[in-house]
Amino acid sequence: MDNYTYSELLKSLQNKCDNIALIIKPEKIKQELERIEKEQEDPNFWQDVLKARDTNKEKVRLNRLLETYQKTKNSLDESTELFELAQNDNDEVTLSLLYEEAPVLEHSVQKVEIEIMLSGENDASNAIITIQPGAGGTESQDWASILYRMYLRWAERRGFKSEILDYQDGEEAGIKGVAFIIKGENAYGYLKNENGVHRLVRISPFDANAKRHTSFASVQISPELDDDIDIEIDEKDVRYDYYRASGAGGQHVNKTESAVRITHFPTGIVVQCQNDRSQHKNKASALKMLKSKLYELELEKQQSTAKNEEKSEIGWGHQIRSYVLAPYQQVKDARSNTAYSNVEAILDGDIDAILEGVLIAKA
């Protein structure tokens, strides 16, 4: 890096910071925080538990956003001032240090951008993830299990918790389907753009001739809804099926019909849960999944109407990302149009750069 390149980087980052300030309005955030603090001083504030909880969550979010912005702005201003002084004094040591810290400065501005993008209505929610293999039998079922592990490892890396709702083993390898919840701050906000088809190209470990195979799996993400969000489901619109939960190889792991499958006729959505030995708990979890999917579907319809466009089909034609393991190694996302070479790390859950790249591309 040289003086000109660093100078242009500072201008670009300052411009981004100015735009961020126009969006978040730091002074208004301070005023809102003062208002919330006064509201919390009222002895009657905590009588409405749900409202108090939501207000406190908003206070935490605003505080974090303001602190992140101010810290980044201060660092950027200090770097700009130091750069000007170092240039005037021909201080090569300081200039070299500034060049080394440039990626950190750039990342801090990007972090504020991400914070803004994770301020949607449901972004702070837990994420319900459903993975289904495409056509292709064992190949696609194995690919679905690889994706499942990738998201679990991502959750582990972030210190998030996960809970299985439904898990169906594949006949030879992999899985026929899985539904699970990732619980953590902004889990849905980060993962919401994972909706779509994920494509894998590799030398098949199941092919004796070691031929290259292409496999597909569908990922669907919906927010876990708070209990205070009311979604009406007409009983005549659904069918409940009860069956025995199955383990590996089709073995019955429960003698009672504790597993629950719900079919919603108007939308064609099917959800199922067999995680618990209690049919009642499985039914409650399946209903929660259905409500989350219906809520997500309605939001997508509203957004499509607002943009005056048709809702994009989340199906086998909606391919969002390719993972190529042979003849070369590369992961490419169709939304950010960015390619990544650290395929092994990505499949081990190192997907933050991809998730953030898509968030920025869709901003």
From Swiss-Prot:
The record, for InterPro entries, names: PCRF (IPR005139), Pep_chain_release_fac_I (IPR000352), Pep_chain_release_fac_I_sf (IPR045853), PrfB (IPR004374)
Q: What's the protein name?
A: Peptide chain release factor 2
Entry's Gene Ontology cellular component terms: cytoplasm
Modified how: Methylated by PrmC. Methylation increases the termination efficiency of RF2.
- Name the protein family: Belongs to the prokaryotic/mitochondrial release factor family.
Its gene name is: prfB
**Gene3D superfamilies per the UniProt record, alphabetical:** 3.30.160.20, 3.30.70.1660, Release factor (1.20.58.410)
Q: Where are the transmembrane segments?
A: none
Q: Name where it's found.
A: Cytoplasm
Query: Which of UniProt's keywords are assigned here?
Result: Cytoplasm, Methylation, Protein biosynthesis
Tell me which Pfam families the record gives. Answer: PCRF (PF03462), RF-1 (PF00472)
HAMAP family tied to this protein = Rel_fac_2
Q: Which residues carry this modification: N5-methylglutamine?
A: 251
- Primary location group: cytoplasm
Function noted in UniProt: Peptide chain release factor 2 directs the termination of translation in response to the peptide chain termination codons UGA and UAA.
List, in alphabetical order, the Gene Ontology terms for molecular function in this entry.
translation release factor activity, codon specific
